[in-house]
Amino acid sequence: LIERSEIEAIFYSKKYEEIIEKIKYNDKNKLKHLISMDSDIHLEGIYSQKELIEKGKELVEAGNREFIDSKINPEEMGIMLFTSGTTSKSKVVALSHRNLVTNIMDLASVLDIDSNDRMLSFLPLHHVYECTVGMLLSMYVGAERSFCDGIRHIVENLNEYKITYAAFVPAIYESMYKNVKRTLEKEGRLEQVRKLMQEYKDKSMEEKKEVFKEIHNMFGGNIRTFVSGAAALDKGVIETFRNWGINLYQAYGLTETSPVIGIETKENSRVGSIGKALPHVNAKIEDANEEGIGELVVKGPSVMLGYYNDEEATKEVMTDGWFYTGDLAKIDEDGYI
């Protein structure tokens, strides 16, 4: 991966010291800078992150503005991400600064989220879903972000950090749903809650939240919005969460699209869909059958630059700026995908 990406610098933790020793500065890669995040001092051929930060502070205090005044070309590659490579050798997705910023700003414009929110990171940051929908979005809106201690501690962290917004994968929500159901069964209150859910089905989210306050407390008591992505989530789970008064929205996208293409929101929500395309995403269906189902094709400033150093692979999925997702979909008369 280091050779294919042609990177020149690596920030690494103690866990990867042995690997770094084996690969550093050889003829097969273009590495120029190795930065240890744990070492307090410079070692042979290796920088200390701590010392570099201190040296940078000294330069800024002395009037050096080289970094502060540096210009960023929005069309240049800002990040590269490796695909999973389940069908062939993994590809290197090249995303520009404009790709990422467009997706972040689009999300901020449609989601009910601001600087008063507290968000929880669970997925790895090299996963574009967590990187954009999680870390970068929270930085853009000024929200507080906490990092999960692990899958077994999700509920504990939701409570501890008073989380109001979180983006997880379907398996997490399915597990939450089962845990609530198991608790209610154990207490002999499952049927009672089901009747209440039916009774309050068409009530406001605030009314539901008050009635199902005990269930809300199982998730920390502060959650306003959950987002599910990376795979399809069972309709029944979505409907149940919403009947409890918890906004659970589906999102869809790919690494190549920075990643979000469509997402449900407070204003545009329909169970079974992934909402409508983001403001700067043009979406259409190619080769639709009689039911309107065909390949989802998208275009816009959040679509990747291409696959790094792989023009052939890029041409296979992109034509005249349109990216062919390889996924079947339909777009209804209201614009829901």
How would you name each of these model-derived features?
Residues A277, K284-E286, E290-I337:
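Conserved ATP-binding/catalytic segment of the ANL
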Residues H97, L233-K235, R242-N247, L254-G272, ...:
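Active-site loops of AMP-binding adenylate-forming
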Residues N103-L107, S175-V180, F226-V227, K235-E239, ...:
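Adenylate-forming
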Residues S39, R194-I246:
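Short gly/Ser/Thr-rich phosphate-binding loop of adenylate-forming enzymes
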Residues S36, K57-F82, K89, D112-R118:
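Conserved pre-ATP/AMP-binding loop-to-beta segment of ANL
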Residues L1-E54:
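Structural core segment of the AMP-binding/adenylate-forming
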Residues V101-R118, L125-E214, N222:
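Conserved AMP-binding/adenylation subdomain of ANL enzymes
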Residues G78-I104:
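Conserved AMP-binding A3 loop
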